[in-house]
Structure formats: C-alpha cells, structure tokens
Amino acid sequence: STHCISSAASDVYKRQGTAGSASDAPKDAVFTIALRLPAWAGGETASDAVTVRGRDDISRVIRDGYLYLTGAWHDGDVVDFDFPMPVHMVAANPLVREDAGKVAFVRGPLAYCAEGVDNGANLHLLHADTARIASDPSCVSVDSIVFHAGAAAQDEQGLGEVDAVDMPMTTLTIPAWREVEDAAQTSALYHDWRPAERKTTTATLIPYFAWANRGENEMTVFLRG
C-alpha cells in the first residue's frame, strides 16, 4: 500500500538545517522511510540529527548514505531533522587555474558569493582572511536578513529589469582585507613590485542563487586568500 509523508522543510531547511516530516499512516502501518544523510551535514555521521518525535521503537539502519527508519507508523508521527550547518572554506581542484590560491564559502547545501553592491568594485582586490578564519571559525558571522531584490531596466526593452521582491535569507560576514589602490600603480600598466598595502575590512557573502538581482555589478564565488 501507499502511505503519504508530508514535509515541512521549505526554505528554513536551507537556511537553518531544521525540518520536519509527518506521516498520515493509519495506526500500525508498518513501512520504511529512507532519508538521505547529506554530505554537507557530515554524511552518515549526521544520523543522530534525525529523530522520531516521541518514539523509541523505530528501528534505525544506516546504509549507503541513507538512514532507514522502520516501524509501525501512526497518523501524526513526526520525523525531525536538525543538521549542523557550520561554515566551510572550500578550495577548488589545484588544476583549476582560475581558482588557484582562492577560497569559496559553503554553509549547508548553499554556496555563497560576493557581489560588488555589498563589497565595492574590483573584487579581485578583496582577500578573505583565511588564516584568521581557520584559527577561529566563530569569527564568521551568520546573519538572517530580509533580502531586497529589484533593479531598473537598462534599456527600453527592459533588459536587466528585476521585480521588487523581499525574501528571508542568510548572509555571511567574513574577516577580509583589501589591497589599497595606489594612484602611482594604477596610472601605469607596469610598476616596480612592492608588497600590497592592506586595508582591514569585512566581506559580505550572499547565497549564490540570489546574485544578479540588484542591478549590474561584479560577482565572484572564489576569493583570493
């Protein structure tokens, strides 16, 4: 027979790692629910983050990246998810030349990016303070905001126009530094090398799916370290 499982995961799952699924099975309907244990949460080590509310008689088997829950399910039984969502710094394969020496940021199932509207122009001069982040991951701030999308058209055909939309979103604020633009250096194509002057700052990162919704500006996923 077929049994219905409803999910209350929605957008909160992507932002907070929490969700719930409810069963409408009649009393003592015995079947198995297979739940994927995502790699971003630790894979099979994340099975303890999945619980059946008020039930300790449901068997649990972990196999091939899934948690199998088997038992006599009742109408209204709820399976809760509470996956950890730490921020990870990610490096590309070293043979990907464009991203050599750079780092990207991932939290839960979402990759993040930097846009010029938040961080200023010339994003290639913006560096993530990887040493500080690696030594103290708590220095990365995870913030819940209301993201304001919307952009005016760039021509009479409506190119680039984005309707005004507000939606809840999670951003990351990371320690960073910028290379100071020296007029003597930027006025010529070449100049004598000297160490870059650093200006301490922070970088604001938004979920990758949200970029290009606030007018024309730069975007990068990988930041120099």
Regions found by a protein language model. Give the residues of each.
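Single conserved hydrophobic/aromatic residue that forms the stacking wall/gate
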Residues: 1-16
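C-terminal beta-rich recognition modules with glycine/proline-rich loops and embedded aromatic residues
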Residues: 10, 22-26, 45, 62, ...
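Aromatic/hydrophobic beta-strand junction motif of beta-rich domains
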Residues: 14-17, 21-23, 35-37
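Beta-strand-rich binding/interaction modules
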Residues: 28-54
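Residue-level marker for the onset of beta-strands and adjacent loop->beta junctions
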Residues: 31, 65-67, 101
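Short strand-turn-strand beta-turns centered on an Asx-Gly dipeptide
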Residues: 49-60, 108
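Beta-strand-rich interaction surfaces with strong enrichment in secreted/lumenal proteins
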Residues: 58, 67-71
